Amino acid sequence: MLPAGSISSAYRKPHTGWQHRAVLNGGMTYNKYRTRARATTRRIRRITLGAGLLVVIAAVAAAPGFQSLASSTIHVLRSEHHDALGEALPSTVWPAQGQAAVQVGESQVQAGPNQHPAPIASVAKVMTAYLVLRDHPLGPDEDGPTITLTDADVADTDHRRGRQESVVSIAAGEQLTERQALQALLLPSANNIAAVLARWDAASVDRFVGRMNAAAQSLGMTHTRYTDPSGYDDPTVSTAADQVLLVDRAMRLPVFASIVATSSVTLPVAGTVRNTDGLLGHNGFVGVKTGSTDAAGGCFAFRAIRWIGGKHTTIAGVVLGQPGHDLVAAGLAAADAMVDRIASPARARAMPVLQP
């Protein structure tokens, strides 16, 4: 696993600075493009239509065949408009293995191949945090109510530690604020705190899991099934496309966005804990959540902000099932490479492309 705030040299990209000269595809400068377009417009304006021709056009337009053709033409124009502002991603964008999906700016979610329900590991904690904040909203400067940890919580933590799960140290009688519990959940990815939050929110883990599944259905996550609040259980499955829908919704919550953008925090008993997101602060990445198990592979739900088409553009995405010796690093590397390919200036068709 990468240390917090670091990233292996295998996938660290140098910062090249902002680019400044507008060039369209094919090497035509933006100014030359505008000059040619204006000349074409002037020629069109000189064309006049006779009254007889207008009558013919009106008659043809009324014909059923023409109406069908017009409908098809409108569809093509809309497709081209969408293509220019948020074009369909080429197959080279997606990771070679596993599955992935992204949403670029305000466009629709686009999914790569192999979209089938699969284990998502700790990416499931995004839903856990989303539900807790939905049920117990926090203001930007609020820490929220306190949660007192019990002997049962300590016993559960010891059991999970024995299974090599990701946990943070706790003590009976320790008090965590809601914000601190969410930080423990999302930064070091503490499975024991996922269970604590589930019981605090819904009185039992099973009831909380039921709420997770109800929320998934309400968000249109039709290929998602949660069986635990941490994602450690393999039967917790989803698709990358489903999880992108959740990332978008969760990042609308300022407290969630603030927590996942934090590199480390200090907890009462655990001390300093660090974010497992080694891409945080690099190449425009601003969060969200890593995950890894043998069954799930390397997983990463993320948001990045990159310079595309002459403006800062948000890229929200998820990669699942990435193979490698270090599964967390594999998920991070796949996301980093995918965002780089999406943000490549060569892909900004029909827009001024910024180049040095």
What are these regions (language model features)?
Residues 1-4, 18:
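Intrinsically disordered, low-complexity segments enriched in serine/proline and basic residues
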Residues 130-138, 199-202, 248-249, 340:
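Short glycine/serine- and small hydrophobic-enriched flexible loop segments
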Residues 134-153, 254-262:
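Short, well-structured active-site flanking segments
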